[in-house]
Structure formats: C-alpha cells, structure tokens
C-alpha cells in the first residue's frame, strides 16, 4: 500500500495555515480596540409625522415608514458598532423612537435638541481628540452642520436624508489630525 506523503504533508500545512489565520482573526478585534482614534457615528432620526401648528415639535412620532427605516438601520448598525459604543439621543420622541430600535443602552443629551449648537455638542463629545465610538441620534440642520464642519466643507451644513448614518473617524497621521469619512448609509438602500 502506497501512502501519498505529499498530500498528507499538504493537509498538515493547510491545518497549520488555517490555525494561523484563525488566530489572527481572533486578535483583530483586540487590536481594533487599541487603536487611537475617535469614531463619530451620526444617525438622523427616521421619517416622522409632519409638524402642525397645534403640535409640540418634540412630541412628533415616527410614521409607519419611519419605523421600518429605523429597524433596517438599527439592524445594520448593530452589526457594525463595537461593544462599548456610547450612544446619545435627542430627547425628541422621533429620535428616541429611532434609537430604541437599536436595543442598546443610550442617554438623552440636551445638546442634540433641534435648536442646539453643533459647536457645543462637539465640545461636549470632545471631538476630535477623544477615543472610542460615539453614536449620536439627532436632527437637521445641526447634524448637517456637524458633518460639514468635521469634513471641512465650504458650506456651513450638508443635506442628510432621514434615517441615514454618516460615520466619521478622527485620526492622527504624520502628526496631523484628519477626519475620514468611513461610510454613509441610507436605510432605503438596505
């Protein structure tokens, strides 16, 4: 009986290479958490009922379409966000209804109200020098102002679709602070 030494040796090499690759994958999460950058994930609330003269703007709820948008985006975010992400929401009902679909702990932040200042909010988050990942759920035009200011856009604000996410990363490269646009995701495209 002939034993194929070459195929037996090749099988051992494949197992050894698999173990190496597997251990690298396991260590990837550990290395990711040790990186020195700040992620700012900005999520605009999903579609809400229209404002009317006699209603309080902060009490507007999501529409049926808005709930579907929030669920789709929350499922995507849950797969992407690292453990330990600090989540903040505007106290407005439509923002809370949006962030609740994520099913993670969050805090209400008064600087995320519709008439708040983007500068005050960024200062309270210590953007861009803090470390870790922050998820903010808020309103236009403030989140558009945050994005434009962080990316150094000429306009003072940019348009942001309802239920969409903009993921920004602040990092230091060659002694210079940079803001990188990691991704923009729309609930309608999921």
Predicted regions and their residues:
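Compositionally biased, low-complexity segments
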Residues: 2-3, 19-21
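Non-DNA-binding regulatory cores of transcription-related proteins
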Residues: 128-135, 140-164
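Short amphipathic alpha-helix with an adjacent loop that forms part of the alpha/beta core around
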Residues: 120-128
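Active-site-proximal alpha-helix that buttresses catalytic centers in soluble enzyme cores
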Residues: 39-119, 143, 156-163
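Domain-level recognition of soluble alpha/beta enzyme cores
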Residues: 154-180, 189
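Acidic, Ala/Val/Gly-enriched low-complexity intrinsically disordered segments
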Residues: 3-5, 10
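Short, Lys/Arg-enriched N-terminal segments with co-localized hydrophobic residues
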Residues: 29-37
